[in-house]
Amino acid sequence: MRADKSLSPFEIRVYRHYRIVHGTRVALAFLLTFLIIRLFTIPESTWPLVTMVVIMGPISFWGNVVPRAFERIGGTVLGSILGLIALQLELISLPLMLVWCAAAMFLCGWLALGKKPYQGLLIGVTLAIVVGSPTGEIDTALWRSGDVILGSLLAMLFTGIWPQRAFIHWRIQLAKSLTEYNRVYQSAFSPNLLERPRLESHLQKLLTDAVKMRGLIAPASKETRIPKSIYEGIQTINRNLVCMLELQINAYWATRPSHFVLLNAQKLRDTQHMMQQILLSLVHALYEGNPQPVFANTEKLNDAVEELRQLLNNHHDLKVVETPIYGYVWLNMETAHQLELLSNLICRALRK
């Protein structure tokens, strides 16, 4: 897929309600599978439906479909073979059949806690379905094996129809996170406030949303072939910005005299507006897919430091504590640097 593809309003609306879309797809797949079973009068018709729901339910993004498809189909076929062997062993010796099933379920549990949990799950489910056939009825067992494989193939087919892209979902979530960050930033440092705003819940939500985005990195990297290190770098910077914002708020509202000094620093306010514009441009780039490198103007921040020194000299009679002031300015400089790095990484992620 093209990483720089512009997102239409319809796509944005659909991906913001991706759980509803996925639920609708599962429901339609269930109904179509049911009609296929009834139309062709397939014996043991319960098992294609069960298999389709078990396989299709957890799959949500296209980057997960292909690798998990092979895992699921491989688990289904292996489970069917193990089940058929178990039924043959039952005709020879029941204890031998039980030992065989125990070994197969051990394999199921061992894989379920490894890198291929769905394959282990399907081995166990398919084995249970096949060995549940009446003793000696190999035809029933074969039909059940075929039904499970049919359900797996139908699940893969329906999942591949208009699949959701983890990369697009990642872009929307990152744009949403930066937009919310910008709102909190404006609320915290608004010159119209007399008291410190209560933003703890908003900061916690920003941090929680940033952590949730980590689950999109692996499938998005598979879809776009963009190295995971770029996504990881963006993830780290996004989290760092939230943490630094909390420290900035603490320094900005540390004491009343220092707050007034910061409030009267014109170049510092200009710098704040500059960073807000950077955030808006990054959000626009994520939606439009046409990024332009944004370089933070650190010279303005250096001018702000000089202006603050002059303000401190003019207010020497007010017992102003310099630590929160220079701490706030340094955090602004570091935030600008992080935004510059974030801009470069987003440009690399949205390359043509």
Curated annotation (Swiss-Prot):
Topology feature Periplasmic, residues: 90, 139-147
Subcellular location: Cell inner membrane
Residues in the signal sequence: none
Any one GO molecular function term: transmembrane transporter activity
Topological domains, Cytoplasmic: 1-25, 68, 112-117, 169-352
Membrane topology: Multi-pass membrane protein
Transmembrane segments: 26-46, 47-67, 69-89, 91-111, 118-138, 148-168
Main location: membrane
A GO term from the CC aspect: plasma membrane
Keyword presence, Membrane: yes
UniProt keyword terms in alphabetical order: Cell inner membrane, Cell membrane, Membrane, Transmembrane, Transmembrane helix
Keyword flag Zinc-finger: no
Protein name (Swiss-Prot/TrEMBL): Inner membrane protein YeeA
Species this chain originates from: Escherichia coli (strain K12)
